[in-house]
Amino acid sequence: MMFLKKILFFLLLPSFVFSQEKVTISGIISDTNSNETLIGVSVYVAELNIGTYTNEYGFYSITLPKGNYTILTSYIGFETLSEKIEINQNVKKNFSLKESKQELKEVVITSNIYKNNVKKPEMSVNKLSVNTIKQMPAILGETDLIKSILTLPGVTNAGEGQSGFNVRGGAADQNLVLLDEATIYNTSHLFGFFSVFNTDAIKDIKLYKGGIPSRFGGRVASVLEIYQKDGNSSDFHMNGGIGIISSRLLAEGPIIKNKGSFLFAGRSSYAHLFLKLTDNKNSAYFYDLNTKLSYKLNENNNLYLSGYFGRDVFSLNESFMNTYGNSVFNLRWNHLFSDKLFSNLSLIYSDYYYGLTLDFIGFNWDSGIKNYNLKYDFKHYVSDKTKLYYGVNAIYHDFNPGKIEPTNSSSGINPDQLAKKYAFEPSAYIDVEQQITDKLSINYGIRYSKFYRLGNEEINIYANNQAVTYNPDFDIY
């Protein structure tokens, strides 16, 4: 451990020495119409040929020598903004980008995309915009995020009628799927034909297929990171749509103009409503709700409360019913310690429920997983050549393997509860993104995590502590 600390010290020492003679420009980049912060906006200093990108909350920071510079900010679907700025001291500068109304001509993708990827140490990462997803062919007129990422290289379908995906040979349960930092355990609606993500409420999608940053843990194949919209803090808007399978409605607007906002987006299928008009008592439907509240306390502090709730229900003749779905909530606090140090504190709750009712036998069965997660992440812009990402994470797991209860007094089922399992998973990480020369950049990091089983458990032992032996003649122990 001391050896690693020494290596890190000598690698970062030049950055600290040279950064003393420089100043920093930092700020937030947002949409002019809605004040929605924009993720992944390119901020480029033309005179120095250096630049950076906004983080998950629209924040950027660049350290550079004193002088006059032309700052270019660009983002797909928005007009590029160019502004000349004199920088003689640390400056906070926010930018607002206007959505581009110009109709784009046919775009031909060339090898330049690979050249751009080589320039960044972040490899095997794909980013999709919501507009791109909505332009793709849709099943029964329903846009689908999971189906869209199947078009990316290295991503395949988990199977017919399933909404999961495999990345480079990994299993579907080896993918970490996050919605506003909260874990989504089941991404499917309606037997896998649709995913649980309402694209009307989504702001940013990023898929890590390799070189996964050390701030993520718990999975080995990939990370699908999804962020919801914050809501329009300027004006009230509503939009929706009616499809063959489901309908949707979104409402967003200011709580306090230019300071706080809300967003509510709901979807529901309605095929089961028509089945009630016939003698058919079968039913299959889903619904979900996305919510988000955002509030700007001051220039250095922001609060976010986001949530998702979804359910799928399938029943046959009122004698069989299957119910499952996700529930997640996240309370976040963004704090800017300085123009170089950004932090985010998150309190996260994730829940997956699975229920089964068999009235002809007379029992209810339910199981599920609950997580309580505390995260504290920091992003430190040490210099124009070095960025540090570090933080801690603590997860409390509550596993319910199964609980069975009789549905009526004539049922022959006795109530029973399989022993619940509990665990605690703390972790800490550090990531370094460093530009060594104009042609060489590296990204390296380390993550430390532990998994603790909690609570009592019944352990069976053999009489007299005799060792277990195997009899090959009778194939018994």
Which residues are covered by each model-predicted region?
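Transmembrane beta-barrel wall of Gram-negative outer-membrane proteins
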Residues: 24, 243-270, 279-313, 321-345, ...
